[in-house]
């Protein structure tokens, strides 16, 4: 497209957020006229979102920053079914109680990125259970089922992948596409939403919603998707060998979150600064051009800005100071992940492998053995030569034992008084 007239599309284009759009010129014209309401849906399959959802959160962040209204759709209803998009198997079904708990945890994430309220551009959060729970099956099929072509739905990549692999796709999951399309229609009626955004895996679902709104209510709706984000080495964004990189501190300490960004591959620094921080693009260009050891300063800025957005400036500052103590001074810092043990248990001897797993430094005893054999397992900065080693009172320094896995991952065993 030519240079966008709307600030939102100009920002997200320049920062690398756009993958596909149903009508880019039409959307640009609409956004240029004044505030537009747009939404992204999030299913409640866990009590936190992880970094894999961050590009969608940042889209909503920039939408609000450029004068529009973000609508966060919580999938309290559709989570009971599960989105089959590009999954090898069905998701386990969750109870209503668990879905409610997960929604409460996810709500905490958005308060860092969006401003909620009653104003024209203040963010709102809605739950699709509010309208899906009351649907009557026969009237719903009569009024809306006729607008969906099964032939076409079978051509969507998300469905074809499962069928080509001869993996079962239940009727329950197949209905997810219809319900997501209905969400778009219902939000258009209730909140005036005109745009749905999402990841590239949601393209088929979004297009269904755009067409349903046009056929049923004559609405002019739009869809915009972001690209799948992978690292320079090809790894999927949001996952590490140690598990998901969660956005809630109850799931992942702010220090670990800071460290995740600090460990970004050199080739990804500029792209991640554009996508996951609000740094001006001229500053991003300057940092991206740094070479050699100087790129580490850019990584620290990436870690600081990303952690500030997710956890606040105080948590980011504490994490940076902890990292400085750990890596520059050899200290322990105050924000490292901790695991508490009783003094009596320590006196009896605690297996190193068990403590490495408890602190998240290793996923299994096999991984502990590998770390020991490679010289990567350390107690108080001293390499361990025996994977069967027991921790005892003699290892305690200043009330804690520092464990390390490699040069960049550390945790504390904190001893509770007897």
UniProtKB/Swiss-Prot annotation:
Pfam families: tRNA-synt_1b
A cellular-component GO term for this protein: cytosol
Class of the enzyme per the UniProt entry, highest EC level: ligase
One example of a Gene Ontology biological process annotation: tyrosyl-tRNA aminoacylation
Enzyme Commission code(s) on record: 6.1.1.1
Domain of life, per lineage: Bacteria
InterPro entries for the chain: aa-tRNA-synth_Ic, Rossmann-like_a/b/a_fold, S4_RNA-bd_sf, Tyr-tRNA-ligase, Tyr-tRNA-ligase_bac-type, Tyr-tRNA-ligase_bac_1
Subcellular location: Cytoplasm
Domain S4 RNA-binding: residue ranges: 350-416
'HIGH' region, short sequence motif: residues: 44-53
Binding sites annotated in the UniProt record for L-tyrosine: 39, 176, 180
Keywords attached to this entry: Aminoacyl-tRNA synthetase, ATP-binding, Cytoplasm, Ligase, Nucleotide-binding, Protein biosynthesis, RNA-binding
Binding site for ATP: 239
Locus of motif 'KMSKS' region: 236-240
Catalytic reaction list: tRNA(Tyr) + L-tyrosine + ATP = L-tyrosyl-tRNA(Tyr) + AMP + diphosphate + H(+)
Principal location class: cytoplasm
Molecular function via GO: ATP binding; RNA binding; tyrosine-tRNA ligase activity
Subunit structure: Homodimer.
Cited function: Catalyzes the attachment of tyrosine to tRNA(Tyr) in a two-step reaction: tyrosine is first activated by ATP to form Tyr-AMP and then transferred to the acceptor end of tRNA(Tyr).
Family the entry assigns: Belongs to the class-I aminoacyl-tRNA synthetase family. TyrS type 1 subfamily.
Protein's recorded name: Tyrosine--tRNA ligase
Underlying gene: tyrS
